[in-house]
Amino acid sequence: MIMTKDGFHSIGDQPGGFTLVELLVVIAILMALAAVAIPNLSGWADNQRLKSVARDLVTHFQYARLEAVKRNTTIALTFNYGGAGDDNYTVFVDDGAGGGNAGNLIQDNESEKTLIRVIIPSDVSLSSTFINNRVGYNARGFPVGGFGGTVTLNNTSRSYDVIMQPVSGGISLIRS
């Protein structure tokens, strides 16, 4: 028994819980919200994946520059694209090891060590304005030949440009 200002009541006399109608209304509201939110979450995930790939590329440009200075040799990046889901890039030591040509921005043989190889997710496409889709940093951390360029990464709704400044070799990331 519980005493209230209206008198004594047994515990079983108090109404509790929700009615079936109230539960159905809440479920209907939640379903309507989910129908709106779920497609937006899918697009959000795609855009986050694109941003992650772009940021990784910026990091790999910076890594290549630092490695070139540290190793006192050319470090090159090559970009391969055009196939469905086959877009990729490679960062390698272009030191002429194994009879190759140092500084030509071509991985002449397996003796020129691969530092990083990245396969781009199939929902992200890659394109490049670099001559022959190759770029490199010399032993002083400047672009080989003093050329700059842009790598564009995009999906169906968004695009990012990774820009290498000519002469200085600085890297910037811009949502385009």
Which residue ranges define each predicted feature?
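Low-complexity, S/T/G/P-rich flexible repeat/linker segments used as non-globular hinges
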Residues: 2, 142, 156-176
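Type IV pilin-like appendage domain
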Residues: 74-136, 161-162, 172-176
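Internal alpha-helical transmembrane segments of multi-pass membrane proteins, especially GPCRs
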Residues: 16, 22-25, 46
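N-terminal leader/signal peptides at the extreme start of proteins
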Residues: 1-18
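Short beta-strand segments that buttress and anchor functional surface loops
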Residues: 151-154
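Membrane-proximal N-terminal amphipathic helix
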Residues: 43-76
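Short, solvent-exposed loop/turn segments enriched in Ser/Thr/Gly
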Residues: 146-149
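Alpha-helical hydrophobic helix detector
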Residues: 24-40
